């Protein structure tokens, strides 16, 4: 684990490995911010055991980097694997369940508070 997380605000490339090297964080965080530009915030997220996240104030896209499991979004439950894309609109209750120990996702927060409206 690195003592000082690095954000790749000036780089044009980051790898899942670079994010995972910074986890867990100093306070046992399971996510790390690796890129910011305008409204876009990119994180690597790798929960262990359970996924404690709560609804977020911005739209959120996930790209599964590794592992398998189930994504629960409201009343909808879907299986996922590496390479899959998942989406949760701002304010929607969502979580990962039954995921493998190696599970990790790219997280992309974007747009205004309250999410984009169609």
Outline where the language-model segments fall:
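A short, N-terminal "cap"/entry segment at the start of jelly-roll beta-barrel domains
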Residues: 1-44, 49-54
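Short strand-coil-strand connectors
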Residues: 36, 72-76, 99
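A structure-centric signal for secondary-structure junctions around beta-strands
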Residues: 39, 58, 102-103
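Short hydrophobic/aromatic-rich beta-strand segments that constitute the beta-sheet cores
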Residues: 42-43, 71-73
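Short, conserved beta-strand element in jelly-roll/cupin
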Residues: 56-71
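Short acidic-glycine-tyrosine-enriched beta hairpin
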Residues: 75-90
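Ligand-binding loop in jelly-roll beta-barrel domains
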Residues: 90-116
């Amino acid at each position: 684990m690195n003592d000082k997380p690095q954000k790749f605000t000036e780089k044009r490339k980051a790898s899942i490995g670079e994010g995972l090297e910074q986890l867990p964080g100093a306070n046992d965080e399971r996510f790390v911010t690796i890129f910011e530009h305008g409204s876009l915030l990119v994180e690597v997220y790798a929960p262990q055991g359970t996924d404690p996240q709560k609804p977020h104030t911005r739209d959120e896209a996930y790209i599964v980097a590794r592992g398998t499991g189930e994504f629960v979004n409201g009343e909808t439950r879907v299986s996922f694997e590496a390479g899959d894309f998942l989406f949760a609109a701002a304010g929607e209750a969502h979580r990962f369940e039954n995921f493998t120990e190696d599970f990790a996702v790219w997280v992309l927060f974007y747009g205004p508070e309250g999410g984009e409206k169609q």
